[in-house]
UniProtKB/Swiss-Prot annotation:
The active site is at D263. This is Bifunctional protein HldE. Keywords: ATP-binding, Carbohydrate metabolism, Kinase, Multifunctional enzyme, Nucleotide-binding, Nucleotidyltransferase, Transferase. The lineage of its organism: Bacteria, Pseudomonadati, Pseudomonadota, Gammaproteobacteria, Pseudomonadales. It comes from Pseudomonas fluorescens (strain Pf0-1). GO terms for molecular function: ATP binding; heptose 7-phosphate kinase activity; heptose-1-phosphate adenylyltransferase activity; phosphotransferase activity, alcohol group as acceptor. It catalyses: D-glycero-beta-D-manno-heptose 7-phosphate + ATP = D-glycero-beta-D-manno-heptose 1,7-bisphosphate + ADP + H(+); D-glycero-beta-D-manno-heptose 1-phosphate + ATP + H(+) = ADP-D-glycero-beta-D-manno-heptose + diphosphate. Pfam families: CTP_transf_like (PF01467), PfkB (PF00294).
Amino acid sequence: MKLSMPRFDQAPVLVVGDVMLDRYWHGGTSRISPEAPVPVVKVEQIEDRPGGAANVALNIAALGAPASLVGVTGDDEAADSLSNSLKGAGVRALFQRIAHQPTIVKLRVMSRHQQLLRIDFEEPFATDALALGAQVDDLLEGIKVLVLSDYGKGALKNHQALIQAARAKGIPVLADPKGKDFSIYRGASLITPNLSEFEAIVGGCADEHELVTKGATLMHDLDLGALLVTRGEHGMTLLRPDHPALHLPARAREVFDVTGAGDTVISTLAAAIAAGEELPHAVALANLAAGIVVGKLGTAAISAPELRRAIQREEGSERGVLGLEQLLLAVADARAHNEKIVFTNGCFDILHAGHVTYLEQARAQGDRLIVAINDDASVSRLKGPGRPINSVDRRMAVLAGLGAVDWVISFAEGTPENLLREVKPDVLVKGGDYGIDQVVGADIVKAYGGAVKVLGLVENSSTTAIVEKIRKSE
């Protein structure tokens, strides 16, 4: 399956569910307490992160999608911290604050990135998250996906009202389920239990065949649009009526902390579906995102640049021959990491030592080098009959194999001016003995503040001379 980056900015999502604050006390441990056989942690830093449904909304916003959140909190300092964090991340949060009841807080005591202890501050809420004076229809206005983030803490008490209201508007409903009664999610477009949650409902599964069979029965009984079972190191299994099961292997390179991985899955799914992606593609993106987030410490969000880079790596486009869409994604990701983009162009028909030296010098002008080459018809117009000697595919393959070159792209026009307008490199480099103002595209690059540099050519290195020498020897 070919992966691509969705248009998350056009994908508004509403999250309703159990809001909590994940609080971390970071410190170091160097001795045992004289009072009891326990380590003493000297706290050096206190960190707050949105958790539960708030983490789902945060993940959606981090991908660039408009995110709204409805939940219940106490009327306390923890709720203030949550509100400030979410506002800073661009999440529109609507909290019902309950006096004399604490916001749910999960406090983790950390020593050198190892969790020593977790302390929970919570009382189940008896109040409906939607007792805000707002109507369900108003909340769903303009929304493309509804997420029910259920941690069984009492904020979600009206599953069916929400599901039916969304279905009436044609809005998909995604639910991250909890508890032993999945009937409350009847009619949802997709539910995303982990394996233990799934088996608590359907019974143990000896193998994938049994998982698929029991999953199909569950979908039928609950009128579900689809079922995604997350299976840890075994990846994910997507089940849909009248479709074969889709098994996706785990993508994690290194598992550091699984906290919040389920939130990342459902948030990526929601944002991708809201952006118009088909379910299998959305699941593949969620699988990729989960593989990234488990490599982070604690409750964490995945950013759009991180997902882009993972897609590029998956599609083999982190380096090499790219189309324009892939190149623009790669450039955006590089810029997100403060990398300087260098651009050069040419025919590069027969690659020689002069080319290699020139490209190494060009790469030294920044962090990433794009080489744009004329396609075959363009070379023929410029160089005359009998050229190019090598086809555009072969020329790009050779260039992509050079250590100095990050990305190679072809263009059909006589000049790369259209590419320059799209890519907007930080530096345009050309080899030759002419002035900067004579470089094709210099005016385009200088207009937006980019730099133009001319590098000298290596003497006695010429493709035309090589071609003539070969012809004379025949």
